[in-house]
Amino acid sequence: MFKKDNRYVTRGVNEEVDIRLQLIMWSMIDKLKDEGNVELDYLQVFRIRKEGKKIVISQSQEVPEYSCTYEIEIEDVQIDDKIKVYVIDSGEYSIMLFTGEY
C-alpha cells in the first residue's frame, strides 16, 4: 500500500497546493509506512492551515485510528483558508485529491 511509484495528484490539488506541501504529505505517508508502528488505511486525510508564519499539517486515518500533527515554518506559502486533502491508495496507484474531487 502507498508504493512510491504510480503516485498521482489531481489538477485541482496541483494548482492550489504548493508543491512543497504536496511532497511533505507524501513524505508523512512514507514515514508512517516505513516506521511500521501503524497499519496504513487506504484513505489518509490531511488538514492544512496557516498559523502566523507556520503551516500546520494534521494527518489522520480511521482504521486503525491514527492522527498526528506537524508544524512547519515556511513563510512564502499562501494559504487563505483551511485545506482538506485526501490521499487514496487503490492498490495499483495512489492519488492526492480534494474532498470535492472524490
Task: Mark where each language-model region is.
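N-terminal "domain-start" segment
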Residues: 1-75
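Short, compact, well-ordered microdomains
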Residues: 63-102
